[in-house]
Amino acid sequence: MSYEVKVEDVEYLRHGNTPYLATIYRPQGSGPFPIMVELHGGAWCRSDRHGDKVIHEALAKSGVIVATLDWRQPPTAPYPASFQDIHYGIRWIKSRAAELGGRADMVGSMGNSSGGHQAMLLAMRPFDPRYSALPLPGAPALDATVRGVIMTSPVIDPLGRYRYAKDLKAKGGPTPVNPDELIPCHDAYWKTEEAMDEGAPASALERGEKVQLPPVLYLQGTDDGAHPRPHLDRFVAAYRKAGGVVDLELFEGEGQGFIMRKVGSPNSTRALEMIIEFTHKQIR
C-alpha cells in the first residue's frame, strides 16, 4: 500500500535567536504509524535535513512518519551539542506522536555517515546526562530510547576514520576521500582524539559500558572508501558480543552514498526495501 504524504517544516528547538527545524513527512491515514527520526550526514559539521529526501519519501509512502532534523554544528557547537539537540528532538517527536498519527513507544532512529554514528551512539546512551541536558517543557518523563536503529555507511569509529584520513593525507596521491575536508571537520567537532574514542560505539562496548542494545540494520557498500571496513567489522563483533542484534548487508561494488547517488539501481532499490521492511518489523 502506498500512502499520500503531507510534508511540513516545524521549529522543534531554539537556541537564542536561532530556530532549528524538523521536516515532518506524514502518511495520510488512520495509523498509528511507526515514527523514524532521520539524521543527516556531513562529517558532523555540514549539510542539513534535506540530504536524504529519497529515503524520507520512500519510508513515508510505506506508512512511516519521518522526522528529519537540523541541529547545532561547529564551529560554534562541538561535541556533544548535536547529541543534546537530537536527544531533545526525539523526545519532542514523542510528545507530538499522537497528533501526528503515531505512538510515543513506536519510534526508531536512522542516519547516514556521521548521522548514522549519532543515531547509534545516542540509541546506546539515551540516559546519558550530557545528551539529555535540554529539558522538554511539559514532558519531563519522556526519554530518547528507540526501538531500532538503521545505519547507512556510518562513521562508526570517529578516531579510526580520523587517523585513516590523516594517513591518506600523509601518503599523498589519489585518495578515495578528500582528507582536507574530513580532518578539519573531525577537529572542529571532536576537538581531541580522546573525545573521538570516547564517542566511538565499539570503544564504549569494549570498555564494558552499560548501554542499550536496540536491533540494528547496517548497510554499506564493499567499495566505500570513506568508511573503512575494519571499523565496521569491529563494531559488529562488539555489538553482537554484548548481546545486540545486527542485520548487516554489504552491497558488492558500491561506494559511499550509493542509495542516494544511484536511485533506481538494483542495489539502491534493494537497500530502500530493506530500510522499509526493518522499520515496519521493529518499530511497532
Question: Which residues does each predicted region cover?
Answer:
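Alpha/beta-hydrolase superfamily serine-hydrolase fold, recognizing
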Residues: 1-284
